[in-house]
Amino acid sequence: MNRSARRRLTAAVLTVVAVTASATACSSDADDTSTKAEGGGTYTIWDPYPQFEKGSAWAKLLDGCGTEAGVKIKRTAFDTSDLANKALLAAQQDNSADVLIVDNPVVSTLAEAGVLTTTEDNKLDTSKVSPNLLAAGQSGGKTYGTPIGANTLALYYNKAVLKKAGVDISSVTDWKSLTAAMAKVKKAGKKGITFSAIGTEEGSFQFLPWFWGSGAKLTELDSSQAVSALSLWKKWLDKGYAPNSVINNTQTTSWQEFASGDYAFAENGTWQLANAEKAGFEYGVIPVPGASGGDAAAPTGGEFVTIPVQGDTGRYATSQKLVSCLTNSENLLETDTTLSYVAPTTEVQDKQVAADAKLKPWVDAVKAAKGRTSDDLGTKYPKISEQMWKAVQSALSGSASPKDALGSAQSAVK
């Protein structure tokens, strides 16, 4: 590996730390599992699912794909934030995994560091993948993997709270009607909405649906549309529709507030579905509305299945077989159900909704979703995101107006 490539990898290690800060996966020690197959050698797969131990459906799927390809699989599972750095260090040592399943925002960082091969290189078929989801794995006009599934944000609502306030959820179609619903809820003695505005990537993740829903672009943090989005959040705090605790809320603590039964709405993700079923009250889900109606684009979460660069190019053909097996329609349905993900293809999404009608609003939200590193932002995104969450913190705490906070953010990005 030449010196310029090593410099790119070293810089990428620093970038990855910022991008993976919003990871919500469970932490765990690495878990190695392997399965035997006739001949063909051993192929390594790294994934961010330490919660799935040896003997789990996920581990069995990996084993099965290895058997189908005629090779032995050695699997290592890491916490999401650890995995990206491990992948970069392995690349520096020319010891990359054969297949790497990684959080979608860091794909562009790994790609620009020269760690990943393109789908064109390895003839991976991504033709059925929804373009908005595939975009999260694209950089410089090239695609560096295929999504295994996606999660995103939407609005959970408490049916009893809205009924008591006389709010028909079908009337909530834009920011004006959503705010009006919160006013009725407050008048009825309950609370409007909870979300996470914490000063980390998690806060940016939660702000993005409102930012994009205003028509704003990440290259113009100080646009009038962006100011309107931050002003909306500030108004909710000033009116008492949202609690001051949102400034420090993570998505977990925000959910705990909603689970108390006192709130009409909560912005949260598909990963809370199991908790929603245990909340003890009837709930519903709607996509985050755009400023003037329609569904706002929410940021996509979820992982990409990628093939890292290898010194032995003869390994790519088998790696391609493994990735194709992991992401075929039959296996995607099982895997995405296990992960509480929405599938990346319309074909499998339809099957998910047919099996569970409650997934429909999530499928709709994913169809409107957008990758944080899309629009060729790539490694520029972490710096933009940091200035965004700082602006949100500044405005909501009252230390600066939304306009001034975003103006400072844009100046810092340039």
Residues of each region from the PLM?
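Conserved N-terminal structural module of periplasmic/extracytoplasmic solute-binding proteins
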Residues: 2-107, 290-292, 314, 318, ...
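Extracytoplasmic "Venus flytrap"/periplasmic binding protein-like
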Residues: 66-131, 163-166, 264-265, 275-276, ...
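Short helix-initiation/N-cap motifs at beta->coil->alpha
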Residues: 77-86, 105, 173-179, 245-259
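Hinge/lid segment of periplasmic solute-binding proteins
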Residues: 103-152, 179, 206, 286, ...
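Periplasmic solute-binding protein
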Residues: 110-115, 133-170, 198-218, 300-308, ...
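Extracytoplasmic/periplasmic substrate-recognition and gating elements
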Residues: 165, 238-242, 277-339
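Glycine-centered hinge/linker elements that transmit conformational signals in sensory
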Residues: 182-186, 219-247
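Long, aromatic- and glycine/proline-rich binding clefts that accommodate carbohydrate-like moieties
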Residues: 337-387
